[in-house]
Amino acid sequence: MDATKLLDNVNVVPVAVIEDKTTAVDLALTLLDAGIKAIEITLRSADALDAIELVANSVPEMTVGAGSIRQVAQLEEILNRGAQFAVSPGATGPLISTAKQLHMPFVPGAATASEILTLMNEGYMLQKFFPAEQLGGTQTLKALSAPLPEVRFFPTGGITAELAPQYLALECVTCIGGSWFIPKALLLERDFARIKEMSRSAVEITHV
């Protein structure tokens, strides 16, 4: 199931690695207060699934997604935990078919024209582009979108406050993912005042 409608009005999605699930709800509330209404919690920590469930149950105003999806079982698990969308750095046949069976809004990853075309043929018009900067950033996206104008991208990886407006200025970019405004160190220190300040700044610079 394509995730375009779900993320169409979102400019920036915080990509969070939550190592302590007890910080999840406070982080979500802080982001909401800063004007951010969606979050991608990556499955890169032992507490990730619990964090997704806590945010889904305690902060219903926040659209919560799960990132770094690699296996079919993970799609089933995040759905049970309350995730509203899923993001993967790539795509496999089993992931695509399972996401469709579960009616889970899914952002599969693509990095080449062939991968993009394959996903378009599966009905996915919003695709993750990762790692964005390492793959050539905005220049690569411009080149890929020239012969493939229908596709839209959700680039993540290496995007900074300085680069964010350049990505969002591209017609082919629906939203970007970033973690520069939710540093892991500040999250572990529970410095939500500083995270709110940085998140508000992120909202300001991404309203291009």
Short names for language-model regions:
Residues 1-84, 101, 161, 189-208:
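Conserved N-terminal beta1-alpha1 strand-loop-helix module at the mouth
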Residues 17-19, 66-72, 88-91, 108-113, ...:
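Glycine-rich beta-to-alpha transition loops that act as phosphate-gripper elements at the mouths
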Residues 27, 95, 99, 141:
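Aromatic/hydrophobic pocket-lining residues that form π-stacking "cages" and hydrophobic walls in ligand
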Residues 27, 71-81, 114-122, 159-174:
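Catalytic cores of alpha/beta
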Residues 32-37, 58-61, 80-86, 100-107, ...:
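Glycine-enriched alpha-helix->loop->beta-strand junction motifs that scaffold or abut catalytic
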Residues 85, 89-95, 128-137, 172-194:
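Glycine-rich phosphate-binding active-site loops on the catalytic face of alpha/beta enzymes
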Residues 94-126, 130-135:
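Histidine/lysine/aspartate-rich catalytic loop segments that bind and position anionic ligands
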Residues 146-208:
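Hydrophobic secondary-structure block in the mid-to-C-terminal portion of proteins
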